[in-house]
Amino acid sequence: SGTTLTEQILASHSQVQGGGELTGIIRVAKELGKTWESRGNLAPGSDEMVAQDLRQAAARYTDMTSHLWRKRSRFTDKMPMNFLYIGVIHLLFPKARIVYCRRNPIATCLSCYQILFGTGNILYSYDLTELGQVYKIHERIMEHWLKVLPERVLEVEYEQLVERPETEINRMLEFCGLEFEPACLDFHSLDRPIATASLVQVRKPIYKTSVDHWKNYETFLEPLFNALGLNASNGDSP
């Protein structure tokens, strides 16, 4: 979906430290859930208790990421599953900026399908129908947050980013409250560890060849098209 490329661009800025796929938000969200579940029905006056819980959770995440924010004034957390926790993120860090990386749904799902993730919570990536179903759920969730938090969530389309990089990069930086720096256009020169399948992509200047890469496999993707409610002829909505 372009998350690695987007993070590499932002991490090329002098004020941003790239954090990669962090698990901290998921961990503190689960801890909050367990805490609140253990109390059953919250008693009167629970607003103060919840506020204290949120402060403690925010402090815990801040402590988990201290190795990042001590280096630069901002850092990125590009865990893809963070879209499930945008509400929690906003409660813990109301000033956080969320960049929603979006790409053609067929291209996104095929990219997931072609990667051997191993065991875990993304076994749906081995089935085209399930992939499409999960993607549709993700779309509905993001439609909600784009409406509810328009000033905190920015949608960036991969196709637009590779077509007009300078315009889109400026838009991202402005959203994040950062001044433009030429290094963000020269992101492929940044030497930092990248532990994702998109490593090769960000070691080169922006290129467009991957935009329609999915069309090479189009005849095999009928279950995915059906699950997404798209036309196989062009990947668009019927």
Indicate residue ranges for each PLM-predicted region.
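Alpha-helix N-cap/helix-start capping motif
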Residues: P80-F83, R103, E139, E159, ...
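PAPS-dependent sulfotransferases, especially Golgi type II membrane carbohydrate sulfotransferases
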Residues: P44-S73, C109-E155, V162-P238
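Phosphate-binding active sites in nucleotide-utilizing proteins
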Residues: S1-F93, R97
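Conserved phosphate-donor/acceptor-positioning beta-strand/loop module used by diverse small-molecule
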Residues: I89-C112
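Short beta-strand segments
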Residues: Q8, G20, F75-M79, R97-R102, ...
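Conserved nucleotide-binding/hydrolysis micro-motifs of P-loop NTPases
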Residues: T23-I25, P105-T108, L161-E163
